[in-house]
Design a protein with these regions (language model features):
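Helix-turn-helix DNA-binding motif, specifically the short coil turn and the N-cap/start of the second
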Residues: 220
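Short, Lys/Arg-enriched, Trp-marked, Pro/Gly-tolerant hinge/linker segments that flank
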Residues: 124-135, 148-206, 210-217, 230-237
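Short hydrophobic/aromatic patch on the recognition helix
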Residues: 72, 223-228
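Generic protein-terminus/edge-of-domain signal
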Residues: 1-70, 87, 112, 126
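Short, Lys/Arg-enriched alpha-helical recognition elements, typified by the DNA-recognition helix
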Residues: 142-145
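Ligand-binding loop in jelly-roll beta-barrel domains
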Residues: 80-103, 108-110
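Double-stranded beta-helix
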Residues: 101-126
């Protein structure tokens, strides 16, 4: 059996285009067990992501958090958040990945009022549980969106209608107020990780040390180790 593998660049940004320039939306009816090492490895993307656990259970690692997702639960991953999914057995995890600009153009009032507060917030993810009323409403909308994608003829307009309903529920039920300190800490950690990953990529044929890797991001050796361990749970050397 051939296993799927996610492709990323040296900063761990996913390189695949989700959807098209005209319709930046993609639906993936995936079984994570069929990926290399039974996981969708560390990656990030500017797009928003919603995943639902229809069968099995999933361990999601988002930023510095570990989240157990049993059957019937889902998760929203915010734009730019480094994350990974892993499983211990076969699963069915339909998910959608789409650009924030699909909901509204960047220079519009809708984008400024309802999209920017979310993608610029300190909230990296939102777990969706069936026993919480508004979270369950989102899960129900997700299943409708999945059904539309599996129909013989794709219904982009119907998909958009459901996405806007979903986004309205998410926006109205969460505190998206920006915390500049939290944003700075999150972005600084991820920027440092990506800088060091870039350095490793550029010098992988050479004999490099932890001190050299840390210096590339202007941090201490202990700081470099902490960023690697807390974000991708491994050592850089």
């Amino acid at each position: 059996m051939d296993f799927y593998k996610i492709t990323t660049d040296e900063t761990l940004r996913e390189t695949v285009q989700h959807g098209s320039d005209h319709y930046p939306f993609a639906y993936y009816p995936e079984n994570i067990w069929e990926f290399d090492f039974h996981r969708i490895d560390w990656h990030w993307h500017h797009e928003l992501e919603f995943l639902y656990v229809a069968e099995g259970s999933v361990l999601c690692l988002a930023g510095t958090s570990k989240i157990e997702l049993p059957k019937g639960c889902g998760i929203f991953i915010n734009s730019g958040i480094i994350h990974r999914f892993e499983v211990q057995g076969s699963t069915f995890t339909p998910n959608i990945v789409f650009s924030p600009t699909l909901l509204a153009p960047e220079n519009s009032l809708i984008y400024e009022k309802y999209i920017i507060p979310v993608i610029n917030s300190f909230v990296p993810y939102q777990v969706l549980r069936p026993y919480n009323r508004w979270e369950n409403q989102i899960l129900q909308l997700l299943t409708h969106i999945f059904s539309l994608q599996e129909a013989k003829e794709t219904n982009e307009l119907g998909t958009m209608q459901l996405l806007l309903q979903l986004w309205n529920i998410l926006f109205e039920n969460k505190d998206w107020k920006s915390d500049p300190d939290s944003i700075h800490r999150l972005n600084h950690k991820q920027a440092g990780l990506q800088t060091m990953m870039q350095y490793i990529h550029d010098h992988y044929m050479e004999e490099i040390t932890l001190e050299m890797i840390a210096a590339s991001a202007s941090i201490s050796k202990s700081g470099a180790l902490h960023i690697f361990q807390s974000n991708i749970h491994c050592s850089p050397v």
